[in-house]
Amino acid sequence: MEKVTGIGGLFFRAEDPAKLASWYEQHLGVTQVPTDYDQSPWIQQTGPTVFAPFEQETDYFGDPSKQWMINFRVDDLDRMVAQLRRHGIEVSVDETHYPNGRFARLRDPEGNPIELWEAAK
């Protein structure tokens, strides 16, 4: 069976796409969409990606009106959280150390939920 080889993009609606793209670049290092074919898109590091549809009634994303949540892998959760907090971004750290790693939550300027994941080493 032929399979997909990975996620090639994440596309979503935004009230102010340019402003939101700048926020992701400034605070999380996700480069913006190239404006021509000579530029490279954001290249993520090799690692696991979880593809998980959730029940409609889930509270995992926080706000029930949000239909998606993105999870970003990070090398050092504590350093990333400190960096975000220095910029005035509210981050909630789950103090539980799970077998698969540690997690933190925040929201982008438009209220979209973001999860940060430091995989277990």
Language-model features: locations:
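Vicinal oxygen chelate
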Residues: 1-9, 81-121
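Core segments of cupin and vicinal oxygen chelate
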Residues: 2-5, 11-50
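Residues that flank catalytic or metal-binding motifs in active/ligand-binding sites
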Residues: 6, 47-49, 66-68, 102
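Acetyl-CoA-dependent GNAT
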Residues: 35, 54-57, 116-121
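Short, charged/polar surface micro-motifs in flexible loops or helix N-caps
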Residues: 46-50, 57-58, 75-79
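Short, charged/polar, Gly/Pro-enriched secondary-structure boundary elements
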Residues: 48-52, 111-114
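Mid-chain, well-packed structural core segment of small domains
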Residues: 63-84
